[in-house]
Amino acid sequence: MKKGNFFANCVFAVSVIFTVLSFSACTDDSNDVVATTSEVIEQAEVPFSVVLKAMNSDGNDITTKGEVNGATLFVFDQNNDFFEQINVNKSTILSRRAIDINCPNSNDITVIAWSGINSGNEEISNMSKANIISDLQVSLKENNGIANIPSDLFYGQVTLHKNSSTKSTVSNELQIIRKTSIFQLSTKGLIKYLGSNAGNFEYRIKNTKSSLDYNGNPTGEEV
């Protein structure tokens, strides 16, 4: 009986040890799986990032001069489908703060920035998930068949690529460049030419395109 009990106890002890070892091995494997999964999630959640830089028509940096009061970013995924719209305030631009953009399942995104749009002078496309990048445009409003004077518009575009070699966010520069200019016209000798100083006189600039497309190029009808 003693031998039998000793044998049974040995078998039980070996069984318990084997079970403990097996459980430890499974626990280690599970930790590896969790760690690997967490790493993948962390990499997927790393956002794209841009910093806006305002430029005048001469190519000079005017970001900190306060001439840009804010901007609207239009984000398109790797298929050029509209993803989201982001409003950026003036302080973010002045301080050159990075703007994070989360666009899941896209290795590349295109960001288009518009600034200075005035609802009284221009209208911009109302974008939704059904739109693509070529649907975005800014159009001049008209008054009695004459296009309104455009506002102080800034435009920029950049394509961002996801960096798979690092887990940290890398900020990319997005330059927004002034698209309009202000000039003055003066006419001398008008009264002498007309023989009178009565009446109102105005200048009309012809052959201006009515819109700017998603690349910031003139398009549409002449106004």
Protein language model features and the residues they cover:
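Sec-dependent bacterial lipoprotein signal peptides
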Residues: 1-24
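Short, low-hydrophobicity acidic/polar segments
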Residues: 56-61, 72-181
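Bacterial Sec-dependent N-terminal signal peptides
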Residues: 19-50
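Contiguous beta-strand segments within globular domains
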Residues: 41-58, 180-184
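Short beta-strand/loop motifs in extracellular/secreted proteins, especially
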Residues: 69-72, 199-201
